[in-house]
Amino acid sequence: MPEFSTIVYAVTDQVARITLNRVDVRNAQDKAMLYELNDAFDLAAQDDGVKVIVLDANGPHFSSGHDLADQTTMADFQPVSNWGGYGKPGAEGYQSQEEEIYLGLCWRWRNLPKPTIAQVHGKVIAGGLMLIWVCDLIIASDDATFSDPVVAFGVNGVEYFAHPWEMGPRKAKELLFTGEKITAEEAKTHGMGNPVVPAQE
């Protein structure tokens, strides 16, 4: 089994649990975490003893989004797609990276051959939505909130492409234009989530 430093992987009673574990940065996703998530999803998908995959997080919040302080480059990792051009200057190189670590990985995870469940609590911000959208079911604690404030600080986000699919175009535009938080109960009414459960459970 691979060694993980940004997540925790465990299998109990045919359930693989993948836990985000960068608590000090509120589980912000750097490239290392994304590739470890990919390895963990592959591990669970290929394990005949695993029937269901659960994605959750340690700490007070599910995820604060992408780690904007990540200084690693694509040369530090082994790509899993056939995209190229990561080292090219400007927009071309940046787009290549986005295709691999955001769009490409998410596409792989959406197509896992086993049921996936996101178990979320606390804040789910921007890139945190990217992680839960790929799951078949989303179970939220009653203290969970969802937001995507990236428009407010002028950053593009691949999550944009999934928001209309997950909650409908009008609610997606409201979420992006205002940057306001959506509660777990409100998220459920817009089709963004499934059961809402008490945080202590």
Annotate the PLM regions:
Residues N21, H66, H121:
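Histidine-centered beta-alpha loop that forms part of the nucleotide-sugar donor binding/catalytic region
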Residues V25, A57-L105:
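Glycine- (often His-adjacent) and acidic-residue-rich active-site loop
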Residues L34-E36, A69-T73, G157:
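Glycine-rich, phosphate-binding/catalytic loops in enzymes
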Residues I18, L55, D67, L131-W133, ...:
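Hydrophobic/aromatic residues within transmembrane alpha-helices
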Residues W107-E201:
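Crotonase-fold acyl-CoA enzyme core
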Residues M1-A16, F62, D70, M74, ...:
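C-terminal alpha-helix plus adjacent terminal tail
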Residues A32-E36, I101, R108:
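Charged catalytic carboxylate motif
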Residues M1-N58:
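Conserved CoA-thioester-binding segment of acyl-CoA-metabolizing enzymes
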